[in-house]
From Swiss-Prot:
Cytoplasmic side: 1-20, 78-172, 235-337
Species name: Mus musculus
Swiss-Prot/TrEMBL domain comment: The DHHC domain is required for palmitoyltransferase activity.
Record field: catalytic activity: L-cysteinyl-[protein] + hexadecanoyl-CoA = S-hexadecanoyl-L-cysteinyl-[protein] + CoA; L-cysteinyl-[protein] + tetradecanoyl-CoA = S-tetradecanoyl-L-cysteinyl-[protein] + CoA; L-cysteinyl-[protein] + octadecanoyl-CoA = S-octadecanoyl-L-cysteinyl-[protein] + CoA
Protein known as: Palmitoyltransferase ZDHHC15
UniProt-listed InterPro entries: Palmitoyltrfase_DHHC, PFA4/ZDH16/20/ERF2-like
Residue ranges with Acidic residues bias: 312-321
Physiological role: Palmitoyltransferase that catalyzes the addition of palmitate onto various protein substrates. Has no stringent fatty acid selectivity and in addition to palmitate can also transfer onto target proteins myristate from tetradecanoyl-CoA and stearate from octadecanoyl-CoA. Palmitoylates IGF2R and SORT1, promoting their partitioning to an endosomal membrane subdomain where they can interact with the retromer cargo-selective complex.
PROSITE patterns the record matches: DHHC (PS50216)
Region (Disordered): 293-337
Listed transmembrane segments: 21-41, 57-77, 173-193, 211-234
EC number: 2.3.1.225, 2.3.1.-
Amino acid sequence: MRRGWKMALSGGLRCCRRVLSWVPVLVIVLVVLWSYYAYVFELCLVTVLSPAEKVIYLILYHAIFVFFAWTYWKSIFTLPQQPNQKFHLSYTDKERYKNEERPEVQKQMLVDMAKKLPVYTRTGSGAVRFCDRCHLIKPDRCHHCSVCAMCVLKMDHHCPWVNNCIGFSNYKFFLQFLAYSVLYCLYIATTVFSYFIKYWRGELPSVRSKFHVLFLLFVACMFFVSLVILFGYHCWLVSRNKTTLEAFCTPVFTSGPEKNGFNLGFIKNIQQVFGDNKKFWLIPIGSSPGDGHSFPMRSMNESQNPLLANEEPWEDNEDDSRDYPEGSSSLAVESET
């Protein structure tokens, strides 16, 4: 009886957490919808008097708004990618590992299993990176998110504002979302500013639109400052080919710690996120090279690194399609030892 109540309570808490995790997204959506109304109707259709100016403002605004909304949608609804089945322990290996009580034997078991996989990063103690919750050997740059309850390929962070884990599958979209958000706020601020001055000087009648125009400038400037800092930080990460987690915790390779282990040079670093074809760099469609399991590394020469030698490290003929759990609103990654 008591166990049933505990299970029901636990299920209810999980349900509440899932609902609450969408609150930050709802806040952003409501702010954006209000900004659309304030700019299109209160500014362009009511306050701006010149027909030509109205048309120019509306065309440019909607062009930016489409890409802003598109990238936000992709950041939210592009599911995080998990390691495929080759990195999961088989049922037999899982039972052997769980039943083995000697830590040194467990470590050796993981070492033997990892020899068959393209895994070059280690824990701080030099052990094979293993997730005891997902029961898999973690690919390079993969981390477990305790919020999403799964391992995420090339995990950057868990973002509450998109209610999703940002990783290999959607980092490009997230970066584009930041860029178009900055552009969106900057465009609103620059076009609204002259009318803000006119209202301030009393050159325009004090009507209902005054509140929307004045508050629109304030909100645009506030978001612009915070977003440009975040966008600048992620641009720096891309230029170094780092994730947020790698910036805080230096990756450890088989040869030892190396903070620039994935740094291939500025252009190649950008291509690792956006791909080789520049015409796709501004469009939110998947163009990041690779499969998220293996990455070129600066710390290895071409004879050691199959990706730099243009060779396939391993083949996967199995169907790896699956449903991934939904994320929730906090940042949580397992600690590695």
